[in-house]
Amino acid sequence: DISEFVRTMPGVNLTGNTATGQRGNKRQIDLRGMGPENTLILIDGKPVNSRQSERISMRGERNTRGDSNWVPVEEIESITVLRGPAATRYGSGAMGGVVNIVTKKVSKEFKGQVNLYANQPQDSKEGATRRIGFNLSGPIIQDTLGFRIYGNLNKTDADAADINAGHGNDSAAGVEGVRNKDIAGRLQWKISPAQTLILDSSYSRQGNIYNGDTQNSNPRSALVNSLADGKAETARLYRSAYSLTHDGAWEWGDTKNVISYERTVNSHLPEGLAGGPEGSYTGLDFVQSRLKNLRFSSEANIPFKLGVDNVLTVGAEFTDSKLDDPASNSQGFKDQGKTDVFDGISAVRGGKASQRNWAAYVEDNISLTDKTHLIPAIRFDHNSDSGSNWSPALNFSHQIGENWLVKGGVARAYKAPNLYQTNPDFILYTRGQGCPIDAPNSVRCYYMGNGNLKPETSI
């Protein structure tokens, strides 16, 4: 998982999405303390959104490891981290920053390798890791057509169920285990000296090894104990991704046009949707959440001189997201003896939700001197649920000597509500946990999606 590498960089933590500590055994990449929901993960510049297929809890957590484990470490060429205002041009979900995982290029010579890796912790209660992978890359037609393929099998055992013993009856679980299977291929066609066409395809299966986590560290039920003792696989994530990229290198500048499609099937045991047992497994029959993301993007980088050197970047994007998660919409209103209807929301609630987003952005990288750069930018988004938003930004950097680089900036960042938050059929019930708006009086209440939510903004 690349999160273990990224966490060593300045401004990077591994946390949950809130300060509750819920799902603390599944920490995700968090930039500048803004939370994983405000950290955008990219693979070769394309957003990865599989974690969005996981239901969001009352406190804003998700039962997910995030999207940092889809590419084997051996296949990564570099990892770029953008923090704060510099990430504004990437739009919703990048309020904290962006992590771009760049995979290895197609090689000009035919070559391949097999990798074996093992890690055995000194403490026998911590999970060991074993991994095997391969890659093969080279030309099919020299200087015209090339390919790359890689595969990976990885297993990290779960921490022992009693690794945090001493907390009474609470189930403060250790780190959950994971089984990964990945395979990916690339065809690269150099159409002309100025144009390259790249076709990417990948498939991954990610399953867990359960060790007793219940979100709220509830006393373990017989079901939870049985699943933990058997090291059961309680969640299986299947991710398929396809993309077609056209790169152009022209006399006037560079262009990149991308069509990408990502499909995630999130198969997991059903979870409680009310009170303290919310997030704890309640049965043995798997349910599914399906998420589809279609994206078109176009970008041009145009160098020019206006007193000093400039590089103007202009781009546009369109995304279409569709979610179908009927199991997470099964909570009713009957718990308080009322009919299962409220404010026009009937007892028959669907799990389908969709969202579209159109965006355009402009950025100018101005080289005031060889060591000083000024970068004004602006981005416009229109979301089918939450409406329009403008995100201006101004960034500055100055090189001081060989070892020091000073950076600063200001921006209006933006986060659109997710597909659960905007779906009025999505309901959670606090039961005996109290209502956040009147917590001292322990009033019960419902969390409901709202199609009229506005985006979050931050300066």
Descriptions of predicted regions:
Residues 222-246, 349-355, 399, 403-405, ...:
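Outer-membrane beta-barrel signature, preferentially recognizing the C-terminal barrel domain
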Residues 112-120, 154, 373-383, 390, ...:
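Transmembrane beta-strand segments that form the barrel wall of outer-membrane beta-barrel proteins
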